[in-house]
Structures are given as structure tokens and as C-alpha cells.
Amino acid sequence: MRDDAPELRGLLQALAQQTRPALEVIVVDNGSSDGSAELARAAGCTVLEHPVPGIAGAAAAGYDAARGDLIVRCDADSRPSPGWLAAHQHAHAHGAAGTVLVTGPGWFRLPRPWSGLVSAVYVGGYLLLTAAALAHAPAFGTTMSMPRRWWREARTTASRSPDVHDDMDLSFQVRPGERVRVRRAVGVSMSPRALRLDRGQLLRWRRAAYTLRRNWRRERPWERWRARCAAASGLGAGHREHDG
């Protein structure tokens, strides 16, 4: 988080209304100067100072500091419903063997019918195109969760470079035989600022392209698909769950 106090205030209010309270709320301050860190501290959050610019490094610092068995991540502009944390926990508790990531959709806070239409194109397009590159569904950083034990393994290969698309890069760490569950119950509303045609939009595309190049150097898309299909064929019919 960097200089996002107004959005953070709304998120903290939503987290305070959760039916299943969090063990802790960690806010990573990535060099803010607008009072965001002070706002988080006043709300009882654990604030980590991470002055080095970059989402991937800041996110990893938060994951490393987490004490709970389940790490749940969202963005400052996310607006989770009261049952959001409970839904993440339920998805892991009742998921198929090998579930390492749970994620869901995001809906832009726009007037109807634009909210549904634009969200379906933007978020749906991202999920489908990235799934083709990964050979499974990707994590959507606006609402995602993972067991801490899995992060301890994934952190050794996940990048902390400011040039990567962090949740896409994390998704590349999912191995054959591991699962990503996509659940509507963990979906959140979010700011439409990602739709702006500005420098931020260009930067996101550059990060995505860099992340694909970085990971495809290690494993080509068809190699990922082949390995995943081979792993799936060994699971048996009893595990044919359409989670990605």
C-alpha cells in the first residue's frame, strides 16, 4: 500500500465487520506519505515498513510476517462482504486435496449494468487468458488466500522484483497436482481505477509481459499443460473437480 488512505479507511471498516475476525491484519506500508500507516495503526493493524518500491516485495514481506495458518490477501480498494474471511477458510477446509490457492472475482464499483459487464470483460478476460498461460486458474490478488506452509515453499522461487505482476508470478509457483480454487463466495467489490488509461495501466501490462517471459524461460506453456495433464490423470475420477 502506498498513499491510499481513503481506500484503506473503507477496507478497514469492512474488515471490522467480518463474521469471523482475523487473527491479525497486516498492512505493508510501501513508502506512504499521506498518513496511511498512522490510519492503519490507529485501527489496531500491524504495520510493516517496506520503503523499497514494488508490490511483489511488499506483498512478500506481509506474507513472511503472517502468523496464522491461512494467509488472506486483498488490496486497499477491496470491499469484502462480512462473510469474506469465513468463505476463504471454508473453501480451504472443504477443498480437494492439493488446494493451495483460493481466489474469486472482483466487481468494479460502477452503476448497473456497467459494473457486471465491465467486470466480466476485464476480470474474466484476465482470468481466462492467464489460465491459458498457466494451465490452471490464476490467483487474483484483490481476493486470494493460501496456507502459510505453502507460501514457505513458494517464497523460494517467487520473485520480489518490482517488475513482476506479483499475483501472476505467485500463480506460476503452483506445481502439477496442486489446485487453485475459484469461488464466487470470496469475491469482492473494488475501485474502477484500474480501468483508467494512464501510466498505471501501461505499467500493469509491462509487469504482466515481464512475468510471462520470466516464467516461460523456466517452463514453456505447453510443458506446463503436459505436466498438469499428467498429474491430473493420476488423480483418478474421484478428484475431477473443476477448480483449475
Where does each model-flagged region fall?
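A conserved acidic beta->alpha catalytic loop
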Residues: D3, D29-A37, S78
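Acidic helix N-cap motif at the loop->helix transition within catalytic regions
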Residues: P6-G10, D34-A42, G83
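Short, acidic, metal-binding catalytic loop of nucleotide-sugar glycosyltransferases
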Residues: A14-A22
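Glycine-rich, basic loop-to-helix element that forms the pyrophosphate-binding segment
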Residues: H50-A66
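Short beta-strand-to-loop acidic/aromatic patch adjacent to the donor-nucleotide binding site
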Residues: G68-R79
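Conserved donor NDP-sugar-binding/catalytic core segment of glycosyltransferases
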Residues: G83-W114
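Short, flexible, basic/aromatic active-site loop/helix in glycosyltransferases
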Residues: T103-L110, S115-A137
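Acidic donor-binding loop at a coil-to-helix junction in glycosyltransferase catalytic cores
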Residues: P162-L170
